[in-house]
């Protein structure tokens, strides 16, 4: 069963210059899924917020100025997307931490998909993800797409990673949801859909006793595991995938 994406939320980072790479992916999805698109940005300045708590008129004016400045940036971005034939609305929020503001907007608007861009390669040691990204990956209530490459012309292959044997106590229906999301993206982009299940080789583990069994480690042979996994996947694949 495919999962519809009617509302796509693109969370932009105010400090990023130029055309955010997440916009390329969002534009493609909006065009091919017929989804409603919303660009959002979160702005916040601690000193301004403190001044507002004290009732300072200057701080309130500064807050309005920051929000309006970011709104103008989003409006310009939305206008450029309109030239591509995609309509996008804009939303600027004030708050901290950014992940909480984004999560609140997802719930308020009822977003079906969150699109977020990573940092440029080399801008952060060892990773292209910020703390905001990690927190959203942990708590986002809807599917989340992390875009990393601005040179984007569509998805050639969509990979759905599932665990039919449920060795890690996944939530009920998680694999079905993954298959539905992957099928939706693959169909919309006319790409190949691959479903994969990766499991440890029993021969790779030398267990001293039956007590020393870790999550994901099991007793069994590769042939039966592969057959069980393949049967589960094929029985739940969308009929037209």
Labelled PLM ranges:
Residues 4-6, 28-32, 103-156:
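Gly/Ser-rich helix-loop-strand patches that form or flank binding pockets
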Residues 17, 122-123, 167, 234:
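Short glycine-rich, flexible loops that bind phosphorylated cofactors or substrates
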Residues 35-36, 86, 111, 142, ...:
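Short glycine/serine/threonine/alanine-rich loop segments
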Residues 58-72, 216-226:
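A short acidic, glycine-rich active-site loop
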């Amino acid at each position: 069963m495919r999962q519809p994406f009617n509302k796509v939320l693109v969370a932009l980072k105010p400090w990023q210059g130029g055309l955010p790479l997440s916009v390329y992916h969002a534009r493609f999805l909006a065009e091919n899924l017929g989804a409603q698109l919303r660009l959002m940005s979160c702005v916040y300045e601690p000193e301004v917020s403190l001044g507002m708590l004290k009732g300072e008129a200057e701080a309130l004016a500064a807050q309005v100025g920051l929000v309006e400045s970011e709104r103008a940036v989003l409006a310009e971005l939305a206008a450029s997307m309109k030239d591509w034939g995609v309509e996008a609305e804009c939303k600027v929020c004030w708050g901290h931490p950014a992940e909480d503001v984004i999560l609140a907007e997802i719930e308020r608007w009822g977003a079906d998909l969150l699109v977020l861009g990573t940092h440029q390669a080399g801008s952060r040691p060892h990773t292209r993800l910020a703390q905001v990204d990690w927190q959203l990956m942990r708590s986002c209530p809807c599917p989340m797409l992390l875009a990393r490459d601005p040179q984007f012309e569509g998805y050639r292959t969509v990979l759905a990673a599932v665990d039919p044997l449920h060795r890690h106590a996944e939530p009920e229906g998680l694999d079905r949801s993954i298959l539905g999301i992957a099928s939706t993206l693959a169909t919309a982009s006319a790409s190949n859909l691959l479903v994969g299940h990766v499991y440890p080789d029993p021969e790779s583990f030398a267990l001293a006793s039956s007590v020393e069994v870790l999550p994901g480690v099991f007793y069994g042979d590769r042939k039966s595991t592969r057959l069980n996994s393949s049967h589960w996947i094929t029985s739940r694949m969308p009929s037209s995938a």
